[in-house]
């Protein structure tokens, strides 16, 4: 076993911080997320209104 002990950096109130970034992930702003949700809600409402006429 190693003779030197290494200690981990302290974390505040049990929260851990990760600094390495995953560049493969999709980056989206909060405004973009809200816009996407609103578009999906409008699309679903339109499907409920005109969907039965289109799909029978």
UniProtKB/Swiss-Prot annotation:
Q: Which residues cross the membrane?
A: 30-49
Pfam families given for it?
Sec61_beta
A GO-annotated cellular component:
plasma membrane
The primary site where this protein sits is membrane
The way it spans or sits in the membrane comes to: Single-pass membrane protein
Name its cellular compartments. Answer: Cell membrane
Oligomer status and interactors: Component of the protein translocase complex. Heterotrimer consisting of alpha (SecY), beta (SecG) and gamma (SecE) subunits. Can form oligomers of the heterotrimer.
Q: Which residues lie on this side of the membrane: Extracellular?
A: 50-56
Please identify the protein, giving its name as recorded: Preprotein translocase subunit SecG
């Amino acid at each position: 076993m190693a003779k030197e002990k290494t200690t981990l950096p302290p974390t505040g109130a049990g929260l851990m911080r990760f600094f390495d970034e995953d560049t493969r992930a999709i980056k989206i702003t909060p405004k973009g997320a809200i816009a996407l949700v609103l578009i999906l809600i409008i699309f679903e409402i339109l499907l409920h209104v005109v969907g039965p006429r289109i799909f029978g």
